[in-house]
Structure formats: structure tokens, C-alpha cells
Amino acid sequence: MRLTAKQITWLKVCLHLAGFLPLLWLFWAINHGGLSADPVKDIQHFTGRTALKFLLATLLVSPLARYAKQPLLIRTRRLLGLWCFVWATLHLTSYALLELGIHNLALLGSELISRPYLTLGIISWLVLLALTLTSTQFAQRKLGKRWQTLHNVVYLVAILAPIHYLWSVKILSPQPVIYAALALALLALRYRKFRQWWR
């Protein structure tokens, strides 16, 4: 049975809650001792992982809609992408304000250039910014065929963001490896699409 438009609306409500509730938890953890002895790193990793989760969820929508024969699921993709950008922005902000500090923001540019994993992170964020700014129907009409070409660049983020995570951890743990593996699996589902590009 296919999902109805009303069911998709309720699904969107649930997805908005999924995007907002982690923020409430983070505020609670900050104010009630729910973080470790290095709360700055905890906040950075939490916001980054949440952004990655929404990125993976965004990439999951198309194959899930196709294989489950639920075309209306596509309507949730933009919402998931926007939450991915929100959490990626919180991740970047947590680094700029908590790691560097508001008085050292002038160092941000040099830090992004001198540390390769940060370079990958800011490239990913800039791509997400471009996709967010052009995610409206107005932008889609204005850009025409170029809109899809631009939004295919999300696959670059699917490569760079997990590498950014893997590179940023001092001790390799299963978690970043799992995220990288999931991203590769979701890209592999698009093998035919990529193959057509290279013909």
C-alpha cells in the first residue's frame, strides 16, 4: 500500500522532531553534566554525527522510494537535507566559537587551510550551503536542468564528510568507519547512475 499525502505530512512532522529533539538533548546535557571531561569535543562530535545522520537519511530517500515503490517519500528529501545543513552549521559554529573562541575567529581561515580534515569539512559545508539556498521550487525553475546537476554535488559531500570524520578522530573507532561504510553503500546503490555519467 502506498503512502498518502496526509501520511507524508505526518512523517514530515516526525522528521522535524527528529531534527529538533537532539538539540534539546544537547542543551540538557550541557546544563546537567551529561557530557564528558572534554565537553567541547563532545559538542563538536555530536553535532557532526547528527549532520552525518541526516546526510545519510537524505541519500537513503531516493533508493528507498524506488525499491519500496513509495514515490511520495521524495517529498521528505528536502526537509532532511535542510536539517543536515542546520546540524552541519552547528558543527562549524561549535568549532569556531568553542574550539577557537570568539576572540580568535581571525584564525579560522588559516586553520581551515592548514588542517586538511578541516578543509574537507568546510568544502562539504559550502556545498550544503549552495544546495540549501537553491532547494526552493523557485530556484529549481530558474536553474532548469542545471538544478539537478548542482544538486548531484551532494554525492561529493557523501565522500568528503565521512573522510572528514575519519581524519578528525585521534584514535580510530568503529563509529566513523560505520558512517563511511554506510555512505559508500548508499553511493553504491547509485552505481548505474554514476556509470551513465562516465559514458
UniProtKB/Swiss-Prot annotation:
This protein's UniProt keywords: Cell inner membrane, Cell membrane, Electron transport, Flavoprotein, FMN, Heme, Iron, Membrane, Metal-binding, Transmembrane, Transmembrane helix, Transport
InterPro entries associated with the record: Fe3_Rdtase_TM_dom (IPR013130), MsrQ-like (IPR022837)
Cofactor(s) this protein requires: FMN; heme b
Name of one Pfam family that matches: Ferric_reduct
Keyword Membrane: yes
GO biological process, one term: protein repair
Cofactor binding mode and count: Binds 1 FMN per subunit.
Transmembrane segments: 10-30, 82-102, 116-136, 153-173
Molecular functions per Gene Ontology: electron transfer activity; FMN binding; heme binding; metal ion binding; oxidoreductase activity, acting on diphenols and related substances as donors
Record's bilayer topology term: Multi-pass membrane protein
Record's function text: Part of the MsrPQ system that repairs oxidized periplasmic proteins containing methionine sulfoxide residues (Met-O), using respiratory chain electrons. Thus protects these proteins from oxidative-stress damage caused by reactive species of oxygen and chlorine generated by the host defense mechanisms. MsrPQ is essential for the maintenance of envelope integrity under bleach stress, rescuing a wide series of structurally unrelated periplasmic proteins from methionine oxidation, including the primary periplasmic chaperone SurA and the lipoprotein Pal.
PANTHER family attached to this UniProt entry: PROTEIN-METHIONINE-SULFOXIDE REDUCTASE HEME-BINDING SUBUNIT MSRQ
Protein name (database record): Protein-methionine-sulfoxide reductase heme-binding subunit MsrQ
Higher taxonomy: Bacteria, Pseudomonadati, Pseudomonadota, Gammaproteobacteria, Enterobacterales
